[in-house]
Amino acid sequence: MKRLLITGGSGYLGRKLVQMARRDWTVVYTYLNNQIDIPRAMSASLDILDRDKVLRLFHNFCPHAVIHTAYSQDNLEVIIQGTKHVAEASEAVGARLIHLSTDAVFDGARGWYREDDTPLPIHPYGKAKAEAERLVNCSVPLATTTRLNKNAESQVATALVNRSAAIVRTSLMWGLEPMDSRTLHLVNCLNEGGRLALFTDEYRCPIYIDELASAILELLNLDFCGIIHVAGPERMSRYEFGLDLARKLGLNINGITPGLSRLSELVRPKDCSLDTSLARGLLKTRISAPSELLA
């Protein structure tokens, strides 16, 4: 069987990818602090900020393909430099690279963003992910206002151009077996009699984790290179999505209250809905709307 390396294999998406890919691939998955055991797959501890260790692992395993899901909300260098190291190592061993990105590379001013729309992130995480996209493929447009700093600009200028890579921008990942962290928080809060405020003016395109993983694995075997949006077909506010989840799980929806992002002090994009026409035409994997799965 062909060999597949998945970074961030102990994360929510990474674990699902390992579980699904091991049927058709010899899989190695990496972790940093959260070591987990997944039968019929091999694990490796890896700090992707350590370039030499990244290159060593790639040369030892020599993967045919790589899915890069590892990231950190707390250390943005993991996103920027870590992605650069993974892209360099993938190129060095001739591996196909699938890089996971986010709808947060957009400012959320209008929604239904296409792959060729210029990223304009408004918070540090989105800016780091936009820079990471450029490190994977310099054909990705990026407004100059999103530059992190002069050092980051020099990193971009010397970045690897991985022409065989695909960049998958996605949205809110959710699932019930196991639950994603947001759903688990909602369940725990409502079961304890608490109240949870969810924004009515912040829109995303939630995608079921199993279907996202299936789409990514399908993409591995295609010749597609460049950016592709893989997200749910339904634009939903966080409030609407939370209510649907609570009803499906038999929870007390009265504990969910509407809130307004614009009245908070948070700097967050309001409407990051993604146009997924390209993915619908390219992939056989069907992506369901939450309203279908939670009915």
Task: Describe the role of every protein-language-model region.
Residues 252, 267-295:
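C-terminal amphipathic/interface module of NAD(P)-dependent oxidoreductases
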Residues 4-23:
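N-terminal Rossmann NAD(P)H-binding glycine-rich loop of SDR-like oxidoreductase domains
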Residues 134-141, 151, 156-204:
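NAD(P)-dependent short-chain dehydrogenase/reductase
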Residues 45-85, 91:
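NAD(P)H-binding glycine-rich loop region in Rossmannoid oxidoreductase-like domains
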Residues 29-37, 48:
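N-terminal Rossmann-fold cofactor-binding loop
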Residues 81, 96, 105-168:
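Catalytic helix-loop patch of NAD(P)-dependent Rossmann-fold dehydrogenases
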Residues 184-195, 204-230:
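Alpha-helical substrate-binding/gating segment
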Residues 215, 222-264, 268-271:
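Mid/C-terminal beta-alpha module of Rossmann-like enzyme folds, strongest
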